[in-house]
Amino acid sequence: MLRIKTCKDNERGSTLVEFAIGVTVFVTAMFAVLEFGRALWVHNALSDAARRGARYAVLHSSGSAQEVKNVVVYGDPAGSGQPMLNNLSTANVNVVYNNFGLNDGTVSVSITGYQFQFVIPIVGTTITMPSYTTTLGAESAGFIPANV
C-alpha cells in the first residue's frame, strides 16, 4: 500500500510561531496607544494648569508669583500636597506681569521644559513637552504685586 505524505508534518509549530508574532505586534501596539493616551492627558493637564495659574493671578492680584506657581504645580497657593503631575515643579513655571496696575495690563503664566516620562520606553525614556502659555487681561485697581 502506498502511503501519501501530507504537508502537515512539515508545518508543525507554525501556529505557535504565528501566534507569538501576532501577540508581539498586538501588545506593542496596545502599549503604544496607552502611552500616546497618557501623553495627551498630560498635554491637557499642563494646559489646564497654566490656565488655572493665570486665573488665580488675575483674581488674587495681592498674591505673589510664588503663590501662582504653587497653584499651577500643587493646585493650592500654600504649595502643600503632591504635585498634580509627576516631574512638574515650580522651576518649570514662569509668571510675567505686563503693565499690571494699568487698565490694559496682562498676566502671563507659562510652563516650559516639562519632561514627559514614558512608563514603557518604546520610543525613548523622556520627551520634552512644548511650552504652555496662558495670558489673561487683568485690572488691579492700581495695585502692583510685590514680585513684579
Regions found by a protein language model. Give the residues of each.
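Alpha-helical assembly-interface signal, strongest on the long, hydrophobic N-terminal helix that forms
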Residues: 1-73
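Short, conserved structural patches
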Residues: 2-3, 51-148
